[in-house]
């Protein structure tokens, strides 16, 4: 029985509703969120994460973030999924990624995401989804 994955499911459910506080209830005050694959500095602390999420929410019309596979090891959750969303300007963006969440008392305190930023940039600029990305994200959702 999974112990950590239900926490991630709670985060995803909150973000589907763009419920920033619903996301933050699952992280520690000292969260370190590396959400740019090393392109930008880590977001450090719950207040900074709140500001980042509040900055994202107004530009996203809807999102379909989902996880295809995961594995747990002690207090780590490894995940593979897609961050798929539609911007209010009309662009459709789908970013396949892998990530790791580290937990302390069932709260996320380290969050690392790994993805190809070129996919994100090109789709945000209006490029269509490639067949390869479509194949990568057309998988069943993990239960």
Please identify what each model-predicted range represents.
Residues 3, 51-143:
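A beta-strand edge to alpha-helix "cap/lid" segment located at domain peripheries
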Residues 1, 38-42, 90:
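Alpha-helix initiation/capping motif
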Residues 15, 35-39, 121-124:
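Proteins with a high burden of low-complexity, intrinsically disordered sequence enriched in S/T/G/P/A and R
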Residues 21-75:
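A solvent-exposed, acidic/Ser-Thr-rich amphipathic alpha-helical stretch
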Residues 11-14, 34, 85:
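Alpha-helix C-capping/helix-to-loop hinge sites
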């Amino acid at each position: 029985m999974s112990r950590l994955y239900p926490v991630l499911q709670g985060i995803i459910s909150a973000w589907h509703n763009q419920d920033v506080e619903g996301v933050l209830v699952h992280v520690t005050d000292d969260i370190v969120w590396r959400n740019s694959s090393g392109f930008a500095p880590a977001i450090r602390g719950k207040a900074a994460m709140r500001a980042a999420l509040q900055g994202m929410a107004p530009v996203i019309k809807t999102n379909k973030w989902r996880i295809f596979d995961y594995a747990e090891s002690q207090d780590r959750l490894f995940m593979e999924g897609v961050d798929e969303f539609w911007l209010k300007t009309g662009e459709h963006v789908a970013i396949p990624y892998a990530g790791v969440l580290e937990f302390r008392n069932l709260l996320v305190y380290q969050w690392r995401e790994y993805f190809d930023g070129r996919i994100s940039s090109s789709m945000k600029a209006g490029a269509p989804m490639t067949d390869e990305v479509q194949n990568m994200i057309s998988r069943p959702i993990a239960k």
